[in-house]
């Protein structure tokens, strides 16, 4: 589903809400209407690497590296993508992840954008660190939402 600007904004807000209110190590996905749905039969195990479980079947473990920007420091949006083996719709699959974090000038506010060519992606939470779960593509990388899709500043209560 192609996301219009307004829908992309709601996806970003929903992603931040989920990041703050969902137990860690939970795999979530958005349905065609942009509503969050639990990863059916999927659980994540954190060991020496990242292990995806699909309906009780273990996917191939793979190591991963979390990308993060220093909190409290004014920094431009940073993103790092990598391939990982995970459970997608009940099957083990290789997908492209994107961790994107954008900081306001004061460095106090964190915004997450989950979009892939204006299509809303799922959201992966690792220890309450949100990552975008985007569809695999051999030619097109997972992209951060363009500036026009950026959600307006919102105060996040601690």
Swiss-Prot record:
It comes from the Bacteria. This is Uncharacterized protein TP_0129. It comes from Treponema pallidum (strain Nichols).
């Amino acid at each position: 589903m192609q996301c219009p600007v307004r829908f992309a904004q709601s996806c970003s807000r929903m992603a931040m809400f989920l990041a703050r209110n969902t137990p860690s190590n939970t795999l979530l996905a958005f349905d065609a209407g942009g509503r969050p749905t639990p990863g059916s039969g999927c659980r994540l195990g954190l060991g020496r690497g990242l292990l995806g479980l699909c309906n009780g079947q273990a996917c191939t473990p793979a190591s991963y590296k979390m990308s993060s920007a220093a909190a409290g420091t004014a920094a431009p949006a940073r993103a790092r993508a990598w391939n990982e083996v995970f459970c997608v719709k009940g099957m083990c699959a290789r997908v492209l992840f994107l961790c994107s974090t954008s900081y306001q000038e004061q460095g106090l506010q964190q915004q997450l954008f989950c979009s892939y060519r204006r299509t809303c992606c799922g959201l992966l939470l690792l220890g309450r660190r949100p990552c975008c779960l985007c569809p695999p593509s051999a030619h097109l990388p997972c992209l951060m939402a363009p500036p026009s899709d950026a959600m307006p500043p919102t105060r996040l209560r601690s």
